[in-house]
Amino acid sequence: MSVVVGDRSESTLMRSDYKAPPSQAIPKARLQVWFFRVCSCILVWTCLIQLFWHSQIFTGLTNHISRFSLPVQSVPLPPPLPPRNYTSNGILLVSCNGGLNQMRAAICDMVTVARLLNLTLVVPELDKKSFWADTSDFEDIFDIKHFIDSLRDEVRIIRRLPKRYSKKYGFKLFEMPPVSWSNDKYYLQQVLPRFSKRKVIHFVRSDTRLANNGLSLDLQRLRCRVNFQGLRFTPRIEALGSKLVRILQQRGSFVALHLRYEMDMLAFSGCTHGCTDEEAEELKKMRYAYPWWREKEIVSEERRVQGLCPLTPEEAVLVLKALGFQKDTQIYIAAGEIFGGAKRLALLKESFPRIVKKEMLLDPTELQQFQNHSSQMAALDFIVSVASNTFIPTYYGNMAKVVEGHRRYLGFKKTILLDRKRLVELLDLHNNKTLSWDQFAVAVKDAHQGRRMGEPTHRKVISVRPKEEDYFYANPQECIS
C-alpha cells in the first residue's frame, strides 16, 4: 500500500531515476513518511482493540479484576423450569397458623398436598391472629417470585384467589381443617372428592397436617425442595442476616443458643420454675386469655420433671459449663425478649461475657424496619442459627426442629439436642449437693453422646402415636446423601 505524501507516493520516493530535492529538504520528507506510518499503526491497533474488546480481552480483564472485588453473584441464574402441564382439580387456599417455623413447615406440606392432588395453590396466608400479632404477609418474609418460579415444574401457584371466588362477589368458601398427621390416602380419598363439588377449598389450619412417614420418596423430596430451595427469605432479610453472620464470624467461632425463655412459651407450657409468684400469676392470666391454648390448669413442677419445660437461663449456664464451653465462648442469643429481662440474663452474661444479640450487633436503624414483626426478627435468628458453629436449643420446639433439619441437610453441622428430662434430674441433684460439680459435668456429657449431637441417624417411627415420632423436618433423611 502506498502512503501519499503531498502529491507523491512512497513508491515514487523510492524510484532510482528520481532526482532528490536539495539536501536540506530530505529530513523533512522522511519525517512526514514516518509520521504517517505511526498514525496508520495506531489506527490499525485501535480497530483491533475495538473488535476484540467485548470478547477475549474484556472478559479476561474483568475476570482478573473480579478476584479483587467484593463477592457478588455473577453466575447467571438458570432459566426457570417449564411449568408442569396438568389439568387442575381445583384451587387450594391455605391459612397458616403458628410462628415462623411452624408456618414454614406447613407451607412445605401444603405445596406437597397440592402436587399430590393436582391442585392450584394460592400463596399461603400467614398467621396474624396468634400471640405475636405479626401483620407480615408472605412476600414480607419470603421471596414470593422465587417461590412461584422455582416450583412451577411441580405445582401451579398463584399470588391471590381470583376475584370471582371471593366473598365480595358472593362466593361461599368451603372451609375445613385437615386431619393432623394424615397420609396420602387420606388426601386422595377424603379431600380430593370434595373438589368435584367445590372449585375452592380453604384449609383453615395447616400445622402438622401431613404424616412424617409412609409417603412416597418423590413426595418426601418435594417437601425438602420447598424447604431448602423454594422458601428463600426476601433480599432485605437475607442481606441483614448475612451481615450478622459476617460480624460474628469475624470475631471467631460462635454458638447459637436458642434460649426459648420467652413469655409466650412459658404461658403456653405452664412452666414457671424460677419465676416469682407475681410472674407465675401473670403467665397464668395470659394462658387463659388465649382460648385456643387448650390446657389451662398446669402443674409446673410435674411438667418440668417430664422434660417438657425450657431450661431457665440459670440452668442453661450450668449445662453449657458442664458441656465444656469456656468463659471466652462467643454466644449468640437467638430469641426474642427474655421473660424477666436483664436480671434473668445476669448470670449468663457473667459466666459468658461474650454474649451477644442482634440488637447489640446492628445499628438500631437497621432493625427499625423489623420492629413489631416477630416473624421477620425470627428469620434473622434462623439465618444465624443455621450458620453457627454449634446450635443449642434449650427447648425442642418448631424452630429447634427446623434449624436442626437444615443443619443436617448442610452436612450434619453440630447441633446439641438437650435431654431436658435427664438434665432436670441432674440439675436438682447438683443443686441439693448430692452431685459434685465434677460428677455433674461427667453425667451431663454422658447424657449427650450418640444421637444428640446432630449425627446421621434414622427417624424414630411410632405409627400409632405420630406426635411422639421424630419430626420429618428435624431429620429429612430421604433428602440427605
Swiss-Prot record:
Keyword tags: Carbohydrate metabolism, Cell wall biogenesis/degradation, Fucose metabolism, Glycoprotein, Glycosyltransferase, Golgi apparatus, Membrane, Signal-anchor, Transferase, Transmembrane, Transmembrane helix
Gene Ontology annotations of biological process type: cell wall organization; fucose metabolic process; pectin biosynthetic process
Family: Belongs to the glycosyltransferase GT106 family.
Topology class, membrane: Single-pass type II membrane protein
Predominant location: Golgi
Catalyses which reaction(s): alpha-D-galacturonosyl-[(1->2)-alpha-L-rhamnosyl-(1->4)-alpha-D-galacturonosyl](n) + UDP-beta-L-rhamnose = [(1->2)-alpha-L-rhamnosyl-(1->4)-alpha-D-galacturonosyl](n+1) + UDP + H(+)
Subcellular localization(s) per the UniProt record: Golgi apparatus membrane
EC number(s) recorded for this UniProt protein: 2.4.1.351
Glycosylation sites: 85, 118, 372, 432
Any one Gene Ontology cellular component term annotated for this protein: chloroplast
Originating gene: RRT3
Residues that hold substrate according to the record: 258-260
Protein name: Rhamnogalacturonan I rhamnosyltransferase 4
Job of this protein: Glycosyltransferase involved in the formation of rhamnogalacturonan I (RG-I) oligosaccharides in the seed coat mucilage, which is a specialized cell wall with abundant RG-I. Transfers the rhamnose residue from UDP-beta-L-rhamnose to RG-I oligosaccharides.
TM ranges: 33-55
GO molecular-function terms, A-Z: glycosyltransferase activity
Pathway: Glycan metabolism; pectin biosynthesis
InterPro entries noted in UniProt: FucosylTrfase_pln, GDP-Fuc_O-FucTrfase
